[in-house]
C-alpha cells in the first residue's frame, strides 16, 4: 500500500501535481484499501474497507515498541474467520476518538482493541499474547496487534520503560523496533 501511494504521489508530482491529495487518495482506493491512508498519512479514522478517512488529532508525545513474530497471517483467512464467528467484543471507536481529541494518551491506550486477535489460530494467538504480556509488564499503557497482524505494538508514555520492553523482546524476535510518533 505504501509503495502504491508513493507511485501515485510521484506520478502526480511528475505531471505537475494536477490532483489534490484527496483526489489521489480516492484514486488509490481503487488500487487497495490501505492506499488512501498511505497517500494522506497522519492520524485518521478509517471506515468502510479503509478507504473512507476522517483526519484526527495526533497522539500526544509517546514511544512505541513494535514486535513482529516470525509467522505470517493470511488477511483473507482472518476476514473470513471474523465473518464466521461471533466476536467477544468490539472496539470502543467513539471513546478512542474522544480520547484522541482530548489528548488523553492513557484513554487511547485503554481503548486499543483488535477483533482479529480473537480469531487467530491458537499457536499464533499465544505468541501475540506473550508479546503483549511483555509490553504490559514493562509499563505499556496498552498493547495490541496491528491490523491483521502479526505485528504487535505497545504504547508507552515513558521512553525508558519502552526501551526495557524493546531490549527484552529483541532477544527473541529479530524484527523488534523502538520508535516515537512523528
Q: What is each stretch, according to the model?
A:
Residues 1-21, 37-41:
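DPxDG-like acidic metal-binding loop motif
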Residues 10-27, 158-171:
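Phosphate-handling active-site elements
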Residues 26, 30-31, 46-55:
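Active-site glycine-rich loop that binds ribose-phosphate moieties when present
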Residues 49-142, 157-170, 174-182:
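Conserved, helical-rich catalytic subdomain that frames metal- and/or nucleotide-binding sites
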Residues 150-152:
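Conserved glycine-rich beta-strand-loop-beta hairpin in the small C-terminal domain of fold type I
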Amino acid at each position: 500500500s505504501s509503495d502504491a501511494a508513493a507511485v501515485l504521489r510521484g506520478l502526480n508530482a511528475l505531471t505537475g501535481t494536477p490532483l489534490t491529495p484527496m483526489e489521489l487518495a480516492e484514486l488509490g482506493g481503487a488500487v487497495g484499501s490501505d492506499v488512501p491512508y498511505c497517500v494522506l498519512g497522519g492520524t485518521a479514522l478509517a471506515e468502510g474497507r479503509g478507504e473512507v478517512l476522517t483526519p484526527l488529532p495526533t497522539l500526544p508525545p509517546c514511544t512505541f515498541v513494535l514486535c513482529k513474530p516470525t509467522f505470517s497471517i493470511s488477511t483473507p483467512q482472518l476476514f473470513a474467520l471474523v465473518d464466521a464467528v461471533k466476536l467477544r467484543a468490539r472496539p470502543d471507536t467513539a471513546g478512542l476518538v474522544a480520547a484522541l481529541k482530548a489528548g488523553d494518551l492513557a484513554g487511547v491506550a485503554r481503548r486499543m482493541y483488535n477483533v482479529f486477535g480473537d480469531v487467530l489460530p491458537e499457536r499464533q494467538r499465544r505468541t501475540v499474547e506473550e508479546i503483549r504480556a511483555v509490553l504490559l509488564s514493562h509499563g505499556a499503557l496498552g498493547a495490541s496487534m496491528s491490523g491483521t497482524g502479526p505485528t504487535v505494538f505497545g504504547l508507552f508514555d515513558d521512553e525508558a520503560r519502552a526501551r526495557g520492553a524493546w531490549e527484552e523482546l529483541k532477544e527473541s524476535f529479530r524484527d523488534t523496533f523502538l520508535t516515537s510518533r512523528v
